[in-house]
Curated annotation (Swiss-Prot):
UniProt region (G1), positions on chain: 12-19
Quaternary structure annotation from Swiss-Prot or TrEMBL: Monomer.
Function: An essential GTPase that binds both GDP and GTP, with rapid nucleotide exchange. Plays a role in 16S rRNA processing and 30S ribosomal subunit biogenesis and possibly also in cell cycle regulation and energy metabolism.
GO cellular component, one term: plasma membrane
Membrane topology classification: Peripheral membrane protein
Locations listed in the record: Cytoplasm; Cell membrane
A molecular function (GO) term: GTP binding
Species per Swiss-Prot/TrEMBL record: Streptococcus agalactiae serotype V (strain ATCC BAA-611 / 2603 V/R)
Positions of region (G3): 59-62
Organism domain of life: Bacteria
Start and end residues of each stretch annotated as G5: 150-152
Region (G2): 38-42
Protein name per the record: GTPase Era
Cited Gene3D superfamilies: 3.30.300.20, P-loop containing nucleotide triphosphate hydrolases (3.40.50.300)
Amino acid sequence: MTFKSGFVAILGRPNVGKSTFLNHVMGQKIAIMSDKAQTTRNKIMGIYTTETEQIVFIDTPGIHKPKTALGDFMVESAYSTLREVETVLFMVPADEKRGKGDDMIIERLKAAKIPVILVINKIDKVHPDQLLEQIDDFRSQMDFKEVVPISALQGNNVPTLIKLLTDNLEEGFQYFPEDQITDHPERFLVSEMVREKVLHLTQQEVPHSVAVVVESMKRDEETDKVHIRATIMVERDSQKGIIIGKQGAMLKKIGKMARRDIELMLGDKVYLETWVKVKKNWRDKKLDLADFGYNEKEY
């Protein structure tokens, strides 16, 4: 039996539904989600395997005009995937008109000279006539291999997109075991789950300034739980106060919600200990970025 495989990048502006799509395809959460822009900071690999095919999806940070060294890292990390894949899914939202950010990405995609499928997400939010206008507008800018409208949240047309990808795969290796769904270690996934809860629960000024470092993660033989110690890094004392909350209430809530997700992922009982530290202006310091997992070697 012939086995087919390939690498597929998911590119687009922030908040267009790239991580929602990847999680839907994988059938579980491997990329965190929130309604805050620039939630995804690292490339996230999702490995979709059947008996005859393997698609290695690479979810990327939302491409934006960077204002910090962290922003530079995110954008370069996203564009670097163009050197690693055979196909690009360029995702745009059906309920927003094409903007300068989309045009900037399109120019890079043209230069890359690899097949691009336009994926119009959030079709559940618009009238069919509006969707047709969106398709015509984007087609006037670039010769896309295909255009596929979907709803990543509801799953509408996602199987059609997957079939299109598998039909176009070439004969190749099975790069990863069938039971492996991502290349990231558990520590990374744990840190992302804690950061996701901070994004959900805190005010607008806080999310972009937060990083999470898992200091230790090991099984406690006495309690038979995985003991995790995680530090939430922020840039200002005021942000530290917001995350801790009155009498520690917010930090407890973050920890409780994160622990539930971590236990689901690990299939194990977890004791999660969280701390908050201030590291001023860490988003503009390359050494701090590397310490917190945002390393230029990634691209």
